[in-house]
């Protein structure tokens, strides 16, 4: 189960899970936590590419899949804004198991990076894009 040191609205309450025996078995540099019950003694871990939540590219980069019905519309809005304003943009659709395993973050449905740094898992609007680009 994915949790966080500080509770996030989109994550299940890990305190509830801990009451049923789950415990923190791994963490990322950004304070996300992996909770599990190691039934057979093996302990799951975050992949190393997830730990730092960083990428090589400097451009605005969005990893996304189509689990949420609003993602397609959101991607088109961001793509149009970036095209009009000459903002370099990389869009990476996570549409295979291999791509999901290679993600640089704990979220496979939507994550945003800028200047190599993880920014958010929230769908972007234009105002949010402008705030990110000012960083």
How would you name each of these model-derived features?
Residues 11-12, 72-76, 124:
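Generic recognition of short, well-ordered alpha-helical segments
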Residues 114-135:
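Non-catalytic, surface beta->alpha helical segment in thiol-disulfide oxidoreductase systems
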Residues 104-113, 124:
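Structural micro-motif
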